[in-house]
């Protein structure tokens, strides 16, 4: 790929990414964002320490197909479940696929909190996003 060229953006395929409330670690989320952009997604990054309401408002505003949440700490993992619950309570859960990741997170935890998938690293996160929207 020519260094000056930009990746082809998948029409209407937005991925919303954020690190959950209480967590200030965003390197992993940033890597997933870069991988998703490289895969052709439009990425909306709501940053770190994002509370459930910030995710809900961003979903309403940007209408992504995929929402990705990151947590680096065991103490902030629960915020993922709270965020999914807030998305459900806002009536938005059927509009998005949710993927989770981060050092303390695993596939079993993802199932337990109601996520649609788990990415063990940045490339896996981008691959999962493609799978969740049916292009992989």
Residue positions per predicted region:
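Long amphipathic N-terminal alpha/beta scaffold segment
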Residues: 1-24, 28
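Cofactor-cradling patches in redox/metallo enzymes
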Residues: 29-39, 44-115, 121-130
